[in-house]
Amino acid sequence: MKLPATTQNRVRTTTIFCWIVVTITMSVHCSPPPPDEGGYIEQLLEDRENKDNFFSEGTDSPVPLDRRSWMLPVRYYEPNLTYRVPASLRISENQPIFEVPTSTGQFRTMQQVGTLEFMLNGEPLTLSALMELPASETTRLFVPFRDQTSGSETYPAGRYLDLDRTATGIYDLDFNRAYHPTCYYDEQYDCPFPPPENRLDAAVRAGERLPAENEQQFPMNTPALLKQEAGGDLPNN
């Protein structure tokens, strides 16, 4: 039976409308809104400047006075929105608890909250999201990682990301905010190493990086500890 022309038009209109609604709904739930590039970069640069000021002048700066001349200002990769991606947190069924070795030869107790799943430069990747124990509540996720720049362009032990918990399970994974642990500046700090599953087979050229090659100086105990922790697979620096 052939529908009248007006009915056919109504069906087409309804179908198109429904498709638009579904598409918009999926976009809203599957990814954060596109960033305001100008405002985002401006805020990022301001935060970097504030960190430099604190590291240079703050009474609680983790950078020893005799190292500030070559460690500061902190060196960064240029802001790059390619390295700001949405990630979905898949909650771990058992949320295992395990011990993580640290830069001082100690251990920290961590719990795997879940796995962050994301795409970076067209490649599917994952990172374990952790919480240090004991903790009264999980308000932030700790994401330590190493990548293909570790040991050459960035600190051999890796870098960190901190993420505020979300109700949706969708996270703004911004590697432009990846930072070096405090033990990079002073070996007296105790810093957990990234777990094996958080060693990315990709170069993350975003966030904090090492000073120029001829200025690289590491705390004396760092290379030996890293070599022991990583089974000898780290380059010498």
Cite the ranges covered by each PLM segment.
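N-terminal secretory signal peptides
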Residues: Q43, R48-T115
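Bacterial signal peptide processing site
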Residues: S31-P33
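Mid-length scaffold segments of soluble, non-membrane domains
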Residues: E93-A157
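Bacterial N-terminal signal peptides that target proteins for export
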Residues: K2-C18
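C-terminal motif of bacterial Sec signal peptides marking the signal peptidase cleavage site
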Residues: M26-H29
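Extended, aromatic/histidine-rich regions of cofactor-dependent oxidoreductases associated
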Residues: G151-E153, I170, A178-N237
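Solvent-exposed coil/turn segments that connect beta secondary-structure elements
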Residues: R90, N121, R146-Q148, N176-A178, ...
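Acidic, glycine-rich flexible loop segments
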Residues: P144-Y179
